[in-house]
């Protein structure tokens, strides 16, 4: 037995050594982990060449590891940067779409106004000559106010157009009755007969309706594109919470610490983390989709009855038709005005001949066919612009609910859907077993990867939700032909708008809206009430002053 003792002992030791060697990891080298770490710009001295004890790790699994404490800290910062970068890329693409479309629309509308003004000027110079030149500021003011409305919104379109026709009637009435002298009081009386006599035919009423609806829709649509651009821009800047940052580190780089540099996070694992980290962004979904639907409705109006291009292109001909109507009916109009306002005073004989030679209205309408209408720099029609934007709007719908999935679909963030068995689940190379939670803050209570405080919504997100809600309301008003009150893009408040209603276009009953003009009182009633209030204030002030004087005397 003794002679077999030494060989048996040696065999036993050999078996034990083999077992111990088999129990150790196949590779203790951290060379690949170190190489990738250095490739990100970090100091190679932070990375060990071989596995070390991982008791120092705070987030990543402890045990033997290729990560030092410095590596874990830097990976934590890197994971947040990676997350911000991918989210920003997703949002920046959408933001760029809205920014470029807003720019195109803005340029198109502004140049459309410039071209319409140029066309009217060219036509009226050829048609009316010196007579137009002497009164051209009237038309410059018209286009100036239209531009001001589009840019700032601080114009009541209906009042502005009514004022234009009143001023034009004043000029026309003087011209067709140049042998008379008219005082300002007399011309004020003339204006009272405007509605009754309709000196310009039906053009003012139709043009007021068309211009108001078209400009409201155009400006609201452009403002909507700007709001969408700004909302996406503000929300694209994400700041991960401490809990989100831990989950990101665990997902993106803790696998490196175990030497699994080529193993990507499981798709569903990534989805849960993104839903937790982007919980507040998910709450934008409802109002965002409502906003997109409202934009699409206004786009349909721009393609149809509210097409600003079809309104502005022939505006010169329409105004000229109105002028010709006034000229052709000038005798009847003048007689009725003289009956209602009394006979005007004739000018002295010398002044009559001079007045007739200087300003008599004798121009007749001649069809004007310009060789070529000016084209906009956008190089396309409104219809094509709207069609393009409609397509982009449809693609943008459900953007926020799709954002977590889109982020995880990026190859830098997770493995593909088809690689569910050989992926990183936060602990090792395995299959991810947890179900994916829903979108939005309220659904994160049971998120297995990220602790989310569902009681504290993000203030910035709440503000963007409110901005979308307000803009959606304005879109519905514009869709129904009603002007809306705006805060300009530059956050300067705009003036009140005017309500035009849907006289010629039936408005869907299901769209609730708040017109700016209250029901129950006519415009005249409202004007009378406002005037009474203004007149009442000076009398109250006077009474107050008298009371102060009496009290002052008593004090003395």
Predicted regions span which residues?
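Extended alpha-helical scaffold/tether regions of large eukaryotic proteins
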Residues: 21-361, 374-382, 397, 404
